[in-house]
Design a protein with these regions (language model features):
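Conserved helicase NTPase motor core
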Residues: 11-22, 26-30, 41-42, 54, ...
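Short glycine-/polar-rich loops that comprise or flank the Walker A/P-loop
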Residues: 26, 55-59, 86-88, 126, ...
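Residues at the beta-strand->loop junction immediately N-terminal to the Walker
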Residues: 31-33, 63, 337, 394
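Conserved P-loop NTPase-based nucleic-acid remodeling module centered on helicase motor cores
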Residues: 59-152, 165-173, 280, 336, ...
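Conserved helicase C-terminal RecA-like lobe
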Residues: 171, 224, 363, 377-389, ...
């Protein structure tokens, strides 16, 4: 039965794909061109480990770059190895896996200023603290915009720089300002017992590097490491993989069974610290690396591949590969250079009408129009409306980005961590309790005087001497609500608590 399953896993794969699936020991670099079946290869490789090599599923780690990719990988593996075996594997994004590690190793976070109940702040929460830091430093928000400060701080973290290191390496004055904001921002994070997404990576790397025994536990657990979209790894992510697979410079205890799948030609996250050099340096950092090139494209015709190859060949830092396809030459690529965006929109609408009239397409849903920025949709939409072409713009706010969901999560986070000032400020007047900015400012001042969190200051608000009667009553009502909810945590189910 085992041999039958093994044969099934290799059926339908081309020769390079088979090599990628069956090369299971030691470091492996799979260079996968677009449309070359890399997702199928990585899932079949994991299944091959379980079914043919008889590796326990819980020893397998698979890292993806999006939650969607993680879900799809798990669904595929459920079909290949079974639901129970798939559940035993660790599959997720770098951030999700690091968050899990930090929860397990929470006792080790105390020296870093965090308790077990730490919360994770999203980009909106980060922006709130960035603004607080800027105002606390009396910096002009119009000149040094919070969004710019946030991006510079995130980039510094992706380069594994602390505030002092960022200040030392600053080339422009705006970077010096950002380093000052960074220092206060980190202090505010810790006072809220919170971490941001970048901290998840940095803190995990720091714990593993400083505690060899902790690192060794994870090396023994995850003996087979897989990384998808490897070209998009930033420095902390790369270091995490090297620690797991190789170890520290003075302790090489990793088994080296690291399989990375990527394509330096497809790197899209350079703004987030990703570097194509990761692909180039992998062979240096992991001795005796085996390289497999997936060069057969199953998605496009040769004309499209040749055009793409002509463009990407100009990149100097890349692994050389030549994609080919069995789908034939295909139609030539048509290029239209418009004078402006209005002309571009007019041409696009006219071309859709032409394709429909000629019968090249059966229905409008066969057409997709892609653009680089949201601002470009205006000219297209105007032309579609004028020419009576029905259309649908894809893309709306994600579930967890909706205001009502973020508000509900803020309530839950505050209940779990009363030191979370950011969450308290978000929901103190949601729904409307007639607690305005002036009252909130009074509460913040009261908390500073008490040298405590906003939640603790709220519990003592009755002792405030200058606060108006209506404002004090509104704050006391909110305080009582939170106390009641905290008291009900142990007794109620989550759904009942939300009701």
């Amino acid at each position: 039965m085992m041999m039958l399953e093994q044969v099934n896993l290799l059926n339908g794969l081309n020769e390079p794909q088979r090599k990628a699936v069956t090369t299971t020991q030691g470091p492996v670099l799979i260079l996968a061109g677009p449309g070359s079946g890399k997702t199928r290869v990585i899932t079949h490789r994991i299944a091959y480990l379980v079914q043919h090599e008889e590796i326990s599923p819980w020893r397998i780690l698979a890292v993806t770059f999006t939650n969607k990719a993680a879900r799809e990988m798990r669904e595929r593996l459920e079909k290949l190895v079974g639901v129970n075996e798939s559940k035993e594997m660790t599959i997720g994004t770098f951030h999700a896996i690091c968050a899990r590690v930090l929860r397990v190793e929470a006792d080790s976070l105390a020296p870093l200023g965090l308790s077990k109940s730490f919360v994770m702040f999203d980009t909106d929460d980060e922006a709130t603290l960035i603004k607080q830091a800027i105002r606390g430093l009396n910096i002009d928000e119009k000149q040094y915009r919070p969004g710019v400060m946030q991006a510079l701080i995130s980039r510094a973290k992706n380069d594994m720089l602390g505030p002092e290191q960022m200040a030392e390496q600053a080339v422009k004055y705006v970077e010096e300002v950002a380093a000052r904001v960074y220092k206060v921002y980190q202090r505010l994070l810790r006072s809220n017992n919170a971490v941001d997404f970048d901290d998840l990576l940095m803190l995990t790397e720091r714990l593993w590097r400083r505690d060899p025994e902790m690192l060794h536990r994870y090396q023994r657990k995850w003996q087979y490491v897989h990384v998808d979209e490897f070209q998009d790894c930033n420095l902390p992510q790369y270091k995490l993989i090297r620690l797991l697979g190789y170890g520290t410079d003075d302790r090489h205890e990793g088994l080296g069974n690291v399989c990375v799948v990527g394509d330096d030609d497809q790197m899209i996250y350079s703004w987030r610290g990703a570097s194509s050099e990761n692909v180039l340096r992998f062979e240096e950092d992991f001795p005796r690396t085996k390289v497999v090139i997936l060069d057969q494209n199953y998605r496009s015709t040769q004309n499209i591949l040749d055009a793409a190859q002509h463009v990407v060949r100009r990149n100097r830092q890349r692994k050389d590969k030549q994609l080919w396809t069995a789908l034939g030459t295909g139609e030539k690529i048509f290029f239209y250079e418009a004078f402006n965006e209005e002309q571009e929109g007019e041409f696009t609408a006219r071309e859709i009408q032409r394709l429909l009239a000629r019968g090249d397409i059966e229905k409008l849903s066969d057409v997709a129009v892609m653009y680089r920025t949201n601002a470009q949709s205006r000219a297209l939409e105007e032309q579609f409306l004028r020419q009576n072409i029905p259309y649908k713009v894809i893309g709306s706010r994600k579930f967890y980005e909706r205001k009502e969901i973020k508000d509900m999560l803020a309530y839950l986070r505050l209940l779990a961590n009363p030191n979370d000032d950011v969450s308290l400020l978000r929901i103190i007047n949601v729904p409307n309790r007639k607690i305005g900015p002036k009252t909130v400012g009074e509460l913040q001042q009261w908390a500073r005087q008490q040298n405590t969190s906003l939640y603790n200051a709220l519990q003592r608000i009755s002792a405030h001497q200058t606060l108006g009667k209506a404002a004090k009553m509104a704050l006391e009502t909110f305080s009582q609500l939170m106390q009641d909810l905290r008291g009900a945590i142990e007794e109620l189910q989550l759904t009942e608590l939300l009701d």
